[in-house]
Amino acid sequence: MNRGSYASVSERQPAPPESTAAAGEFYDEMWERYGHLDAASPAAFHRRRLIVELCQRHAGGARHVLDAGCGRGELLQELRRALPGAELSASDVSLASVRETARLNPALRVFQMDLSRPDFDRVHAADLGRFELITCSEVVEHIPNDRRAVERVAKLLAPRGLLVLTVPGGKMSRFDELIGHQRHYSSGALLELALGAELDPLEVLAWGFPFQNLYRSAVRVASRFSMPSPSEPKSRGSSRNISDLLGASYAVFGRALKPLFYLNRNFWGEQMLLVARKR
């Protein structure tokens, strides 16, 4: 397996705010503007499918499960169906996401969690060592100190607990920069994150060849011409227009591409997935 550089793409995007309140507000706004794109994206659909398959294969008997970085709860819904005997919890730094997920899942525990806050261990002391399975999908690429973030997720795992982590690979698009990506990853970088958190990797997948890669290349080209760079001023109106345009494109092309994504392979792809066990 290729052990590439730690951050395989240069870190061009300014860091999102460090404080929990400011970071939460940033991602509240991102979900408001662009959250609907996730529902139409074939990449997001198949990413959730792969996560569920990995959870069932490696941790089907887990009793306590956390979806760390739950967004609006799409993955959580699929985990509920796939792991009917588990006690599920969910967390996110975005308070709007926490409230929406709690509204849709009133029987579940849903709470705000900021993996960057200095007093993380004190705030989440009751959950340290609690979960046999944690999913953390498309989260740590947003966090300036991703090593520390993964170490903190690992602290929440029970002994021999399992982490299923996903991050993007390949080059960043302008859209990635706008929504706060700090970096993208290689297989080697993902392995380093796991080992640095004292997790033993069980599987590392670079899924998506060829159709995910082609799809991501198209997104990079489209966003270069349709979106402002992160350094340019942007109005809410222009962002909403861009979001609507992308949403319409996703709805049309996503429906056509979704079946093709079943043919993607677990190598040379730009969707990185890690399964790792706590020592």
Where do the model's predicted regions map?
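Conserved N-terminal segment of class I S-adenosyl-L-methionine
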Residues: 1-129, 133, 137, 147-150, ...
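Acceptor-substrate binding/catalytic loop of class I
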Residues: 38-43, 174-193, 209
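Short aromatic-enriched loop/helix-cap "lid" or pocket-rim segments at secondary-structure transitions
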Residues: 123, 175-179, 213-219
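Residues lining the SAM
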Residues: 137-140, 166
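A short glycine-rich, Lys/Arg-flanked "PGG" loop and its adjoining helix->strand segment in the class I
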Residues: 148-159
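Conserved beta-strand signature within the Rossmann-like core of class I S-adenosyl-L-methionine
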Residues: 161-167
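Conserved S-adenosyl-L-methionine
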Residues: 199-210
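Short, electropositive alpha-helical surface patch
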Residues: 218-226
